Amino acid sequence: MNAHKERLESNLLELLQEALASLNDSELNSLSVTKVECSKGKHHALVFVLSSDHKILSKLKKAEGLIRQFVLQASGWFKCPKLSFVLDDSLEKQLRLDAIFNEIAKGKDND
């Protein structure tokens, strides 16, 4: 990945965290953005958020205009990518893997 794209994704991640924190909705401003992936043309960004509630995605979609406006004002960019929000399930996967490894370790200890 090139350095420009990495820098853009990093900046966008920070700006999105600030944008969510500035919203009046307590569910949205407590969300954590874990990762941002920009498309090759940088017109679209996939935003991974840490939440177990699927209803939060509809709230984020409704607030997308406010979030993009905040990003534009805070960054000074000419254009903000279109944001698509996705629930980040990597933590759940990691916890499942840890549980499996713990079971394997217990099985070896019992032998």
Swiss-Prot record:
- A Pfam family cross-referenced in the UniProt record is RBFA
Q: Which domain of life is it from?
A: Bacteria
In terms of PROSITE patterns, this protein maps to: RBFA (PS01319)
User: Where does it primarily localize?
Assistant: cytoplasm
Q: Name one GO cellular component term.
A: cytoplasm
What are the subcellular locations of this protein? Cytoplasm
Cysteines engaged in disulfide bonds, as pairs: none
State the Gene Ontology BP annotations: maturation of SSU-rRNA
**Which keywords, in A-to-Z order, does the entry hold?**
Cytoplasm, Ribosome biogenesis
Q: How does it assemble?
A: Monomer. Binds 30S ribosomal subunits, but not 50S ribosomal subunits or 70S ribosomes.
Describe the function of this protein: One of several proteins that assist in the late maturation steps of the functional core of the 30S ribosomal subunit. Associates with free 30S ribosomal subunits (but not with 30S subunits that are part of 70S ribosomes or polysomes). Required for efficient processing of 16S rRNA. May interact with the 5'-terminal helix region of 16S rRNA.
For this chain, the family text in UniProt reads: Belongs to the RbfA family.
The protein's name in its UniProt record? Ribosome-binding factor A
